[in-house]
Amino acid sequence: MAGHSKWANIQHRKGRQDEKRGKIWTRIIREITVAARTGGGDPSANPRLRLAIDKAKAANMPADRIKYNIDKASGTLEGVSYEEIRYEGYGIGGAAIIVDTMTDNRVRTVAEVRHAFSKYGGNMGTEGSVAFQFKNVGQIIFAPGTSEDKVMEVALEAGAEDVITDDEGAIEVLTAPGDFEAVRDALGAAGLQPEVAEVTMRPENTIALEGDDVARMQKLLDMIEDLDDVQEVYHNAEL
């Protein structure tokens, strides 16, 4: 199945992550902390913690640091308590934006997120104002040049819902959140290594931006992503 090109967006995101690895680690540590506190410190019995550990390994976080943060969150050591808060709003051209945060000070966080929205012409919405435009899915993306036939065969056999190839040849595998790990592991066992593998909020439809609106939207997204309390940013703009 064909789809819009998203390869440039992936490369932009990976480039920014490489530039700020320390911040990526901070976000992952927060995710490990919340996952371990809510579901326990045993990864085999805590899917959310398993995914957080996978993110940590992908970001080259040392194993002893991963273990330390799991132990800390599980109650062995004293730590900071984080609250998960989701904000929703609109960016340039009415594009929908979801901002997931983990914070120890919700007053600070909402002020910073609201400021980022307003600085570049966006605006905060109410709870539920844009979330209905997204679907929670497992997403596994392969670089252009990967065998589409092989990905499709393995993914669908393992329980994937859809396989989409974009205009540049990048291949996107979509799964139900509960099937994500099984599909990802089956693809890995077949020698297929993805560029992206995560459970995410995927837009049901996208909004095309043109001219200066593209740069303005990217600046808005970058500013939100750079906020200390922000974990993930989802949007439906074509950039």
Swiss-Prot record:
It comes from Acidovorax sp. (strain JS42). GO terms for molecular function: DNA binding. This is Probable transcriptional regulatory protein Ajs_1898. GO terms for biological process: regulation of DNA-templated transcription. One of its GO terms (cellular component) is cytosol. Residues 1-21 are annotated as: Disordered. Keywords: Cytoplasm, DNA-binding, Transcription, Transcription regulation. The keyword Transmembrane helix does not apply. It is found in: Cytoplasm.
